[in-house]
Amino acid sequence: MEMSGLGRKRVSKWDSKEDTHHHHSSVNANSASYYRDKESEPVRFNAESNGEARTRSRVSQNNDNSYFSEQDGTRQQFVRRSGSRSNSRSRSRSRSPVYRARRDAGSYDRHKTRTQVSPTPIREFNKRGSDHLFDQSRSDHYGWEDNIRKPRETKYHTDDFREEAMMEGARSSDYNNTDYPEDNSRIRRRRSEFTGEKETQRRDGGDGEGGFHRSSNIPCKFFAAGTGFCRNGKYCRFSHHVADRKQPQDNNNNFYRQDNNNHTSGHNKWNDVERLDNGRVGGIEVSRASKKGVSESKGNGSSSWIDDMEMSPDWNYGVQALKKPVKEDHSVGIIGQSSQSRVLKDDQRSSGMFSHGGRTMAEKPVAASHQSYSNSVNVAPVETFNQNHNALPYQSSLTAGGSQQVLAAAATNFSVGSNLSNLESGKVYQDNHHSTVEKPVLVQNTVSREQIDQITNISASLAQFLANGQPIPQLEQALQLPLHSESVQPNQATTQSNVVSSNPNQLWGLGMSTGAEGVPAVTASKISNVEEIQEVSLDPKENGDKKTDEASKEEEGKKTGEDTNDAENVVDEDEDGDDDGSDEENKKEKDPKGMRAFKFALVEVVKELLKPAWKEGKLNKDGYKNIVKKVAEKVTGTMQSGNVPQTQEKIDHYLSASKPKLTKLVQAYVGKIKKT
């Protein structure tokens, strides 16, 4: 206790002596120096050597007698810093002045230092150089970054610190204080101002840090840098629990804010999406949005029906972002296991809906991702529909009936109860024409086994009809009729519940006609558009109509030989239809280009057929023109407006097939004109 008392007297004496100098109360001690004081205090005294500060570096320097004198400011500052302690530790440790440390230091104390202790703070101070306090006085604010950016402030140094200390002192001071320590009074005065202010603040608790922290509470500067790595490893004296400690206030907004709802930079962060390690329930990995993205939808009667579905592995395709998020209440969806496990391993935010067991979970924020949806309704097995590849903003909901579909407003006009032509064309008929599907898309299909069998039978019957070239009943009527109540209009949401018809020529309740995996070869991939269907299906009928009309007349003429009555009947029929022909001619003038091109090609064929009679002189000019006109009107009159070949290739094919019939018709007209 004697030593402690003597140490306190010395401290008070030095304080009163230094107060005669310029003592600025406005100077605030920085946080970096505060932490260094805290860090260095446990090293300065040794209980085994009667509480006297004995260090290896101090002995070597003092024996040299070239670095510091007894009145050097460096010594004063160190003693002042070592003596500035709280009352709780002053009774247990001595505050003996520096000359005792110099006198008693020896080889015994070199080996009696505390275990696992770094070199002492005087060594650290010499390593930093004499400009250390000047650098601090010139800076405006201090924080963790001051310690981070100065690699010389580490507490573990090499043995060549004496040379570096001399170089640093010579570089940063006005005089070389290692050679002329007594003359450098300005440096001593400035250091004493800082140390006096520091001690006053620490005695009075001016820092707001009332109690003294142990070395274990002092954060390690390497961990404070955010690297998570300390080069001293487990032998480091300082705390590595930096993440649990509150950071300085000036760095709060930079790197410490970990709030789930805080997006400082305006973009999505990964703390919005929490990856559940224990989310592997039944082989399905679950990714949920944090705190507000996950909602459980409790649908009416939404039982565990996902296990009954047949999952296909290759239905994962790109989906654009939906304009509206899917409703949380009563919404049900499916995600295949293969695509889900693939998507959730990406670094993107996955969203959508999935169902496991009896619980259906929906992720509210719908974002664009490489994820496919098959929003199907828990309905009767008759009625299903699949997602279009353009990701149209429709939603599926469970109504009270449990077997109805609702498509949202502004959705495209899906022909749910479409007929054969809509199915084969692979198109979705819409009013706005902004999402036409030209080819089948592999999507998840949810159909029952009965429906697959029915569709298989229907497709087989269709293939037979098309192969045999037989006219399909009700096809012409279906093509000409506009879409009626069976298709959902874009501006109103209607519910529908259709039943599969027993007629194999009609396909009802097939939902979207884009083709699906569960439907085997619905001929959508074979036929590209409606026009080809019309030609394939109706051209045999047209040819048959023309063949029957013309062949009946020609066969009657053959049976009677050159019977003039029959020939006159044919011509009379044409003459009776002259008035109608004039009207038809007016209509033909308004026909589109396709009809005109067909007419011109037909006229050329008729002229070629009339050349022999014209050369033989059997026809005059007027008769020639009349025959050409009547034959053209006769052929085009039998054709329906929607069945006229449009391209030149189709026109040539049609005329070459019907050339024998045209020849007989032209001969009948020539015979009629001869007899007149």
From Swiss-Prot:
Residues 563-583 have a biased composition (Acidic residues). Residues 1-134, 172-217, 245-307, 487-506, 533-594 are annotated as: Disordered. Keywords: DNA-binding, Metal-binding, Zinc, Zinc-finger. GO terms for molecular function: DNA binding; zinc ion binding. Residues 251-262 have a biased composition (Low complexity). Residues 58-79 have a biased composition (Polar residues). Residues 12-21, 101-110, 124-134, 192-212, 269-278, 538-562, 584-594 have a biased composition (Basic and acidic residues). InterPro entries: Zinc_finger_CCCH, Znf_CCCH. Signal peptide: none annotated. This is Zinc finger CCCH domain-containing protein 38. It comes from Arabidopsis thaliana (Mouse-ear cress).
